[in-house]
Amino acid sequence: MTQHSRDTPQFYLTAPSPCPYLPGRHERKVFTHLVGNKAGELNDLLTHGGFRRSQSIAYRPACDQCRSCVSVRVIANEFRASRNQRKILARNADIVGEQRNPVPTSEQYSVFRAYLDQRHRHGGMADMTVLDYAMMVEDSHVETRIIEYRKRTLDTGITGRGGDLVAAALTDVLNDGLSMVYSFYEPGEQNRSLGTFMILDHIARARRLGLPYVYLGYWIEGSKKMDYKGRYLPQQRLAPSGWIRVDASGEYPEPQD
């Protein structure tokens, strides 16, 4: 029997299952394990090719008769916030983002649990326990951070620490950008539009780090759950011919390297 190296990726295909985004359709995924010394390099390469990471697994849709899931990445240096997005930034001027190592806490899980119960109670993650959450955060062989968003306090300017946790984002640092793996927020703060705010904050962070892109995962036209990702322009969308730029007018110029 041939023994495969841990650094040599092996790809697998899942059986069909109901699509969680488009009613009446079925999904399949191709996936591989991100392990070994080259896990970071492989994650970079696969993300550029439209894969997403979940713990130590990299996956992408491989549906038989559907190509609706389109990988998108925001062009950070060219992004200009819309009027509504600027209002959201102003509304959250009292929020401080703190980058941390991927260490799960009970405070994070409390917000995560409330988020699932309010926003995704019938979703595939609805039954996640505190141990499941810990695995989601810790089980990474690539450069991963968790960014906590807290309310500013009187001592924040001195200590650099915020107060109550209102949101968090699990984020991979790639060679050409930031990849938002999963984000969640306190549902009682829904008037803040914290999901949008975290994306805007990641775009600003990518700029400061000199990274060209923020990877948002899959945009699905016609899906209420995923259509919002098309609002961050200009962006690039992965087509069979490569990454295609989409500007503010919705036009599709030449492929991008």
Curated annotation (Swiss-Prot):
One of its GO terms (molecular function) is arginyl-tRNA--protein transferase activity. GO terms for biological process: ubiquitin-dependent protein catabolic process via the N-end rule pathway. Its main location: cytoplasm. InterPro entries: Acyl_CoA_acyltransferase, Asp_Glu_LeuTrfase, N-end_Aminoacyl_Trfase, N-end_Aminoacyl_Trfase_C, N-end_Aminoacyl_Trfase_N. GO terms for cellular component: cytoplasm. It is an enzyme of class 2 (transferase). It holds the Pfam family ATE_C. It catalyses: N-terminal L-glutamyl-[protein] + L-leucyl-tRNA(Leu) = N-terminal L-leucyl-L-glutamyl-[protein] + tRNA(Leu) + H(+); N-terminal L-aspartyl-[protein] + L-leucyl-tRNA(Leu) = N-terminal L-leucyl-L-aspartyl-[protein] + tRNA(Leu) + H(+). Keywords: Acyltransferase, Cytoplasm, Transferase. It is found in: Cytoplasm. It comes from the Bacteria. Its EC number is 2.3.2.29. Belongs to the R-transferase family. Bpt subfamily. NCBIfam families: PRK01305.1-3, PRK01305.1-4, PRK01305.2-3. Functions in the N-end rule pathway of protein degradation where it conjugates Leu from its aminoacyl-tRNA to the N-termini of proteins containing an N-terminal aspartate or glutamate. This is Aspartate/glutamate leucyltransferase. It comes from Rhodopseudomonas palustris (strain BisB5). The lineage of its organism: Bacteria, Pseudomonadati, Pseudomonadota, Alphaproteobacteria, Hyphomicrobiales. The gene is bpt.
